[in-house]
């Protein structure tokens, strides 16, 4: 027998793996899952993130959720920075309603949110929501995203 055994070499796309071992299959339905469990096969479940309706939910973070799902250690959730919280506080206190500064509750009603979420954002603990950040930028006239956080969104025009 030579070093090059031509009988054992199989090249091509139609070459089967051989053996009668169990193949990997996708189970669709509860009855097929129960049958696989009864047979004693190894069952692995994987969640398919952002499958069909990604256009309707642009905020879905599929890659991050997969990374969180596969990691063994605790992954800290994304939050807004303390700098954003300080900018929100400063801009909110600068806006006067009557003779008092704007409260968190008044800001929340103008941004179509709750006072608790505004408080989380001001502490720097809130989960970033682009829609809410856009509303806050519009109401407070302050940039909360990008490089120049805290700067006025639209500069006041000087009167001539």
UniProtKB/Swiss-Prot annotation:
Residues 104-123 bind DNA. The keyword NAD does not apply. Residues 88-147 form the HTH cro/C1-type domain. The keyword DNA-binding applies. Transcriptional coactivator that stimulates GCN4-dependent transcriptional activity by bridging the DNA-binding region of GCN4 and TBP (SPT15), thereby recruiting TBP to GCN4-bound promoters. Involved in induction of the ribosome quality control (RQC) pathway; a pathway that degrades nascent peptide chains during problematic translation. Required to prevent stalled ribosomes from frameshifting. Belongs to the MBF1 family. This is Multiprotein-bridging factor 1. The gene is mbf-1.
């Amino acid at each position: 027998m030579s070093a090059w055994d031509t009988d054992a070499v199989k090249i091509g796309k139609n070459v089967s793996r051989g053996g009668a071992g169990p193949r990997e299959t996708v189970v669709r339905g509860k009855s097929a899952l129960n049958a696989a469990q009864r047979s004693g096969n190894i069952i692995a479940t994987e969640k398919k993130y952002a499958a069909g309706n990604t256009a309707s939910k642009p905020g879905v973070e599929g890659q991050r959720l997969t990374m969180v799902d596969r990691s063994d250690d605790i992954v800290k959730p994304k939050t807004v920075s303390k700098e954003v919280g300080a900018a929100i506080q400063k801009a909110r206190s600068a806006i006067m309603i009557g003779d008092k500064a704007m409260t968190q509750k008044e800001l929340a009603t103008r941004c179509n949110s709750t006072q608790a979420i505004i408080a989380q954002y001001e502490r720097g603990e809130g989960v970033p929501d682009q829609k809410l950040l856009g509303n806050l930028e519009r109401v407070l006239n302050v940039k909360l995203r990008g490089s120049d956080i805290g700067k006025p969104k639209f500069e006041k025009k000087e009167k001539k």
